[in-house]
């Protein structure tokens, strides 16, 4: 077998190990929230009791999803009381504190994903975050304990999930 054929097969095997993930986002809060995500997910309105999904491609590094509150938008511009991202409905920047963060890397360990909840940027809403085959993380108040959430940059609250899984984020569980 030629060197180029072997290289092609190896690349195909590694690429097959990681795939996109679907993030189901549920709003259990008593009012509308505006979930946002970078580098994918942008932003959207999510009424109380509603669920929406975003697809995150394999290879996404340092992704974040958070809920903005107290927002008012006219077209694609406006402002939010918490988690605002430059006054835009569709975020391309991280939200302003305070914002409870769901953080993730999809396919970062070849066949593993990594995820955590972070309150380093402050706390604005309670959150549950889980993958279909991993630990269920819960952060219900600003002092949620490690290993449930990052509170300081040196915490070790990252969890692993086998690749090819989907995720559930619930705000106000």
From Swiss-Prot:
It comes from the Eukaryota. Keywords: Pathogenesis-related protein, Plant defense, Signal. Residues 1-20 form the signal peptide. CDD domains: TLP-P (cd09217). InterPro entries: Osmotin/thaumatin-like_sf, Thaumatin, Thaumatin_CS. The keyword Signal applies. Belongs to the thaumatin family. This is Pathogenesis-related protein 1A/1B. It comes from Hordeum vulgare. The lineage of its organism: Eukaryota, Viridiplantae, Streptophyta, Embryophyta, Tracheophyta.
